[in-house]
């Protein structure tokens, strides 16, 4: 099947859902050769991925993953990476605030690819054990309301594609598949992307994958987060319906920050930034966390406004709840 798929892609022809599913199954089972994987990814990149293709690929990744079967609603906050901004770990820090506000967070991520410090690097520096399996993380969700699923542990089938991705050295569909392949099938999600053109298509993909409430965001300064430095494009998902709008920090009482104020460092520096924010340090970094945590709380709890979410995030930090969550 993958040979036929490569032929079609090289002729700029879209794949059917079945072709996309079988091709990804061949890649993730070791059936496809390295040359076939490289050809497939390159031809797909040159053609451009469709919503149906991305949905099918993500479904295969979820099926192949070690999965967490959890009864309650779960929230995921994640970015694609690739924005080359070297910010501190905004989503990771926001995750503690979201969880401390009473929302169960099932975060999924990896070590750094394009920045100095990925989510896994920062959490490791904070003392988090990365190699927890599904049963252990289900227990974490029950006991503390938050878990981290280390991508290599949960997506072992990626081992066939990973060397090819490194050798290719270009963005491929896998750059966007990771955030779409949460092993706990979180049904509420805030996802940041590195390109404006991805916002609405990936919101449709998330909806296809069963996300009931969520949003895909792109900061107009290039961040794959809700930025504190500019406006952010948002495509919100609510029960299969999409709504696109811009979010401006100034509408929530925050002046624009300078991008240099959001820059982080290595994993130890970023871990300390996270500790400082959760302990109540004010400034642009806190504002970035409040925007992302506030939007997440709005998406996770029915009947709130974004301002309500930001207010809850502030209160969660100021009362010490987020700091305590990071020290559990």
For every predicted segment, state its role.
Residues 1-87, 101, 105, 255-262, ...:
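Acidic, glycine/proline-rich low-complexity segments that act as flexible tails and inter-domain linkers
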Residues 14, 83-84, 111, 120, ...:
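Gly/Ser/Thr-rich beta-alpha loop segments that engage phosphate groups in nucleotides
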Residues 41, 88-144:
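A glycine-rich phosphate/pyrophosphate-binding beta-strand-loop-alpha-helix module
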Residues 22, 56, 60, 96, ...:
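Alpha-helical scaffolding segments of alpha/beta enzyme cores, especially the outer helices
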Residues 39, 55-58, 136-140, 217, ...:
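Beta-strand segments within the central parallel beta-sheet cores of soluble alpha/beta enzyme folds
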Residues 8, 63-66, 87, 102, ...:
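Glycine-rich anion-binding loops and their surrounding alpha/beta cores
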Residues 18, 35-38, 92, 117, ...:
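A generic alpha-helix surface/boundary motif
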Residues 79-84, 109-115, 154, 220-221:
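Acidic, glycine-rich active-site loops and adjacent beta-strand->loop/helix elements
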């Amino acid at each position: 099947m993958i040979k036929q798929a490569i032929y079609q892609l090289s002729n700029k022809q879209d794949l059917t859902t079945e072709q996309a599913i079988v091709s990804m199954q061949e890649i993730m089972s070791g059936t496809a050769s390295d040359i076939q994987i490289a050809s497939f990814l390159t031809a797909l990149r040159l053609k451009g991925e469709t919503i149906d293709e991305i949905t099918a690929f993500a479904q295969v990744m979820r099926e192949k993953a070690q999965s967490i079967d959890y009864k309650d609603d779960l929230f995921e906050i994640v970015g694609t990476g690739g924005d080359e901004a070297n910010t501190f770990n905004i989503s990771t820090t926001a995750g503690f605030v979201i969880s401390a506000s009473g929302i169960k967070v099932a975060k999924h991520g990896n070590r750094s690819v394009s920045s100095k410090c990925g989510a896994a690097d920062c959490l490791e520096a904070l003392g988090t054990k990365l190699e927890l399996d599904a049963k252990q993380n289900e227990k974490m969700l029950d006991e503390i309301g938050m878990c981290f699923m280390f991508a290599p542990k949960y997506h072992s089938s990626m081992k066939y594609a990973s060397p090819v991705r490194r050798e290719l050295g270009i963005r491929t569909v896998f750059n966007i598949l990771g955030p779409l392949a949460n092993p706990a099938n979180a049904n509420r999600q805030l996802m940041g992307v590195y390109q404006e053109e991805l916002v609405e298509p990936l919101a449709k993909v998330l909806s296809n994958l069963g996300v009931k409430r969520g949003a895909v965001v792109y900061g107009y300064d290039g961040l794959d987060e809700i930025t504190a430095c500019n406006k952010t494009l948002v495509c919100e998902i609510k029960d299969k319906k999409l709504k696109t709008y811009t979010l401006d920090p100034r509408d929530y009482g925050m002046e624009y920050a300078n991008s240099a104020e959001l820059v982080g460092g290595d994993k130890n520096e970023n871990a300390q930034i996270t500790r400082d924010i959760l302990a109540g340090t004010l400034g642009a970094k806190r504002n970035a966390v409040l925007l992302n945590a506030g939007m997440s709380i709005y998406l996770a709890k029915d009947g709130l406004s974004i301002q309500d979410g930001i207010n809850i995030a502030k209160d969660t930090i100021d009362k010490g709840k987020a700091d305590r969550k990071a020290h559990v």
